[in-house]
Amino acid sequence: MKSMKPFFLLLAVSISLGTNAQRIKLVEGDLSVLKTEQKINTEFAYENMRVGKFDKEEAYVVDKKESLNKKEAGRGDTWAKAWVSDRNARFEPKFNELFEKSSNLAISKNAKYTLIFKTIFTEPGFNIAITRKNAEINADVWIVETANKDKVIAKATVQKAVGRTFGGYDFDTGERLSEAYADAGKALGKFIKDKL
């Protein structure tokens, strides 16, 4: 039994390292202007987003909608509406909630600076009970002046923000993706807090 302890320790370490593979990198500018700020505005953009194996989001939506409608009339139409409405209803609130908790910056429309979270890649993942693939997002992040959004203060990238739920009961695409946005918000908030 003693010889099994190192094995389990190694297994636990490798699992914890594997689940925290998200990378955030400051690619331009300086975050020090946020040092005296207590709030920040957030905006989200989804233009020119790649989805899974598709170079254009529109192609993915058409393919998925047709596939679901073939299985059950109207199901694809319902899914397509949720694909867009989940952004305001689920993804953005989850991001903001976890970002606030980990950054100590309150989200406010009248803040001096705005964080623009531009999702550039989405892997919706899947869960069909016997096998699954986690959701994942990549994004470009810009910190700009709220009054003059052409004035970019800093740019960063977020890679591999993972969406999954404890227990694996994330059969809904929106649920998996909302967890990816929560993961991104938490990690980005901590990243900014650590830089200040």
Regions of interest found by a model, annotated:
Residues 24-26, 102-152, 163-171:
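Surface-exposed short loop/turn segments
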Residues 44-49, 119-124, 157-159:
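Generic short beta-strand segments
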Residues 91-106:
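A structural motif corresponding to the C-terminal end of an alpha-helix
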Residues 1-26:
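Bacterial Sec-dependent N-terminal signal peptides
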